[in-house]
Amino acid sequence: MSRKKMGLLVMAYGTPYKEEDIERYYTHIRRGRKPEPEMLQDLKDRYEAIGGISPLAQITEQQAHNLEQHLNEIQDEITFKAYIGLKHIEPFIEDAVAEMHKDGITEAVSIVLAPHFSTFSVQSYNKRAKEEAEKLGGLTITSVESWYDEPKFVTYWVDRVKETYASMPEDERENAMLIVSAHSLPEKIKEFGDPYPDQLHESAKLIAEGAGVSEYAVGWQSEGNTPDPWLGPDVQDLTRDLFEQKGYQAFVYVPVGFVADHLEVLYDNDYECKVVTDDIGASYYRPEMPNAKPEFIDALATVVLKKLGR
């Protein structure tokens, strides 16, 4: 039986490939407005603090490659071909769709490397992909909208949290707080009934219950530099408040809204949150990110096949 050929569009935020890319990358995020010199320097300093340009670009490539390979191994009806489409740097989402079209792909499935749906992120990625496909004609894209509740994905984090708690000294384990977080978005998304905040709360509940952790809280991180109010509480403020209320000896951070080691995790968690835990005299823990680990790739493959009714 011959296999059907299908495009696998893997979308992500994107990251600079080298230091010279930082300004144009930041300008794209700011919708064509160049950043002020001090804003640009601040971003460069953050990258410098994590040891240079974030590994995200390489990790995204590995995730897409491994997902293609795994999908082609676990079923025999479809041959998937992966294409990477990024929001803020090349290859842009439109570039990936054009590449699929050029390769004669007529059907594709898309997945965003962000587990929770929001109008601000996932919906805009899928919209860009579908608009480009319609413009070119002859290409239909089926889009995954969210996958935070995929049992295999939840299990990935449950296992990491259990390992982290098992590694703690007993006195810390009995006095630890789990903080589950995602990228903050402007508060106005709530006016449109955006499910994003509820999905993060559901994620936190699934992970905490699965790991047998009763002391947990939900926080937001990495908010943008705009005058609008953003979803809170911020993880750093939350850490201080929880410490003042209960005097926790250890904080465990699970940035479940992210799937890879990049600036938001390596700087906003591993540096900024650790500054807070050091200041209050508590221990800092942050389990390993999914990156391209086999159990995470298997979770994504399961999500894709379920979306296609297989």
Swiss-Prot record:
Family: Belongs to the ferrochelatase family.
Function: Involved in coproporphyrin-dependent heme b biosynthesis. Catalyzes the insertion of ferrous iron into coproporphyrin III to form Fe-coproporphyrin III. It can also insert iron into protoporphyrin IX. Has weaker activity with 2,4 disulfonate, deuteroporphyrin and 2,4 hydroxyethyl. In vitro, can also use Zn(2+) or Cu(2+).
Oligomer status and interactors: Monomer. Interacts with frataxin/Fra.
InterPro entries found in the cross-reference section: Ferrochelatase, Ferrochelatase_AS, Ferrochelatase_C, Ferrochelatase_N
Regulation: Stimulated by Mg(2+). Inhibited by Cd(2+). Inhibited by N-methylmesoporphyrin (N-MeMP) and 2,4-disulfonic acid deuteroporphyrin IX (dSDP).
Reaction equations catalysed: Fe-coproporphyrin III + 2 H(+) = coproporphyrin III + Fe(2+)
GO cellular component: cytoplasm
UniProt note: pH dependence: Optimum pH is 7.2 with Zn(2+) and protoporphyrin IX as substrates.
Outcome of swapping E264Q: Retains 21% of activity
Binding site for N-methylmesoporphyrin: Y13, R31, G32, R33, H183, K188
Effect noted on mutating E272S: Abolishes the effect of Mg(2+)
Official protein name in the record: Coproporphyrin III ferrochelatase
Binding site for Mg(2+): E20, R46, D268, E272
Disruption phenotype: Deletion mutant requires hemin for growth.
GO biological-process terms attached to the record: heme biosynthetic process
Pfam families tied to this protein: Ferrochelatase (PF00762)
E.C. designation(s): 4.99.1.9
Binding site for Fe-coproporphyrin III: Y13, R30, R46, Y47, S54, Y125
Effect on the protein upon substituting K87A: Retains 92% of activity
Binding residue positions for Fe(2+): H183, E264
Enzyme class: lyase
Gene: cpfC
Consequence of substituting Y13F: No change in activity
Taxon lineage: Bacteria, Bacillati, Bacillota, Bacilli, Bacillales
Gene3D superfamilies noted in UniProt: 3.40.50.1400
Keyword terms of this UniProt record: Cytoplasm, Heme biosynthesis, Iron, Lyase, Magnesium, Metal-binding, Porphyrin biosynthesis
Pathway assignment: Porphyrin-containing compound metabolism; protoheme biosynthesis
Principal subcellular localization: cytoplasm
